[in-house]
Amino acid sequence: MNTIEIKSDEEAKLIKSLEKRDDFEAKRIKRYLEMPDLSRIPGSPIAELSNRISALSRFNNFDIVKIPEIVPTHILFDLFNMPSGHPARSKSDTYYIDEENVLRTHDPVFWYYYLNHPTIKERIKNKETLGAICYGKVYRKDEIDRSHMNVFHQFGAWLITPDDKNVITSDDLKNALSDIATNVFKAKFRFYEHQFPYTDPSFEMEAEINGKWIEMLGSGLVRKTVLVNMGLTGYNGWAFGFGLERLAMASMELPDIRLL
């Protein structure tokens, strides 16, 4: 696997501006940013889970992508079909650094950064099939309780290919997800239709873990309109993403997310 770490000069500037601020919101955001990324801490159940999934043979040629944690709203929301007025953009749901930049709320934002990396742009010119995995912290203004945290970890992946090479189907996606359920969790699973702004058709998968059916992940075929928003045409593919804490809790039979 090839690791691609994408840094943002704008993120560095915004972090410096936070350091100069003394208001409550700035202090709170700084504290969240300083929290460890458990998906990269050896020995953490979160890291163990992300490593086990990444190690599946079907992901052998996928890139591992690390992206900024402070992202512009037009990238996080507009490009993903969440326009002005969408509930996800509410300041009651999302941590705003300023009017145009927020703490990332969902993992698929890595698509944009990945597609704009110089190496990947060159591979697109060569009409290569591309696969990538991204995991790390995300931030939402959820009320903290036994099953929710406002800072948690997501794992996402996608596979895209030129239209003239292959047309990826829902069955291809479900085969990939079945691989995770059976080989990582040794679990029974089932799919049902859902809706997401950036995939169509979309599916959620439930898995039976330790005798309980739990919502495991969201997935779907990548919307062509979203790819066009990011400047890419002539490609198609699948994507999925899920919260690592939810699955770690289920597999370890933990009663409270705060025990992780």
Tell what function each PLM region has:
Residues 2-260:
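TRNA-recognition modules of translation machinery and tRNA-sensing kinases, especially anticodon-binding
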